[in-house]
Design a protein with these regions (language model features):
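Mature, structured domains of secreted/extracytosolic soluble proteins
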Residues: 2, 31-192
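N-terminal charge/polar-biased segments
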Residues: 7-8, 28-31
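Bacterial N-terminal signal peptides that target proteins for export
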Residues: 3-18
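Bacterial N-terminal signal peptides
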Residues: 16-26
Length: 192
């Protein structure tokens, strides 16, 4: 009995392998990666930062702040952006009344400054951030949309972000891929 696979011409097997490799290479890596759940909700790589964030029960304060600052259209746009997204618990660590004061219309400029300090142009995955930290001899500077830099450091597999005032937040959920960038969930609010 002859094995049909062995009898198939070598050229057709090679062509099939080449086609499979070419098709795989044509798809972005994010298509193969499963996004982590955030705030009890699935995050979809084909949705925007805003479309995903509104579903996270851990980011209701951030979403309300983004709306109050008028940044919904920006963060729904093409980007790409890297967003360091503070949780509700991170906002709760701020002095009492801070969030309520910031979301008032008269404080829109200050709120916008704080929120855009959490956004960096481009897609910076945790792996890319760690490579930049290594290249920088232990730290990397990222220029934010607000204009001031954030300092990124790492220890083991953890990534830390330090603001202009010296406060450090830990990335608790990394690489939440979006159609217009990436979100890294953090446990602190960064301040320029």
């Amino acid at each position: 009995m002859t094995n049909a696979f062995i009898r198939r011409p070598l050229g057709s097997r090679a062509a099939a392998v080449a086609l499979a490799v070419a098709l795989g290479a044509a798809l972005p890596a994010a298509a193969f990666a499963k996004n982590p759940m955030v705030g009890g909700a699935p995050m979809y790589a084909d949705k925007t930062i805003v479309e995903n964030a509104v579903n996270s029960k851990d980011h209701t304060t951030l979403v309300a702040a983004v709306k109050a600052a008028g940044l919904v259209d920006t963060l729904s746009g093409p980007g790409p952006f890297t967003v360091f997204a503070p949780t509700n618990a991170a906002f709760a660590k701020l002095p009492a009344g801070t969030v309520e004061t910031l979301v008032k219309p008269e404080n829109k400029a200050t709120l916008t400054k704080i929120l855009t300090y959490h956004v960096v142009p481009g897609v910076h995955t945790a792996k890319a951030l760690m490579a930049e930290v290594k290249k920088g001899g232990g730290e990397a500077q990222l220029k934010t949309v607000e204009g001031e830099p954030l300092t990124v450091t790492s220890k083991g597999k953890k990534v830390y972000v330090t603001d202009a005032k010296g406060s450090t937040a830990t990335v608790t959920v990394a690489n939440v891929m979006q159609s217009n960038g990436v979100i890294h969930v953090i446990n602190g609010v960064l301040q320029p």
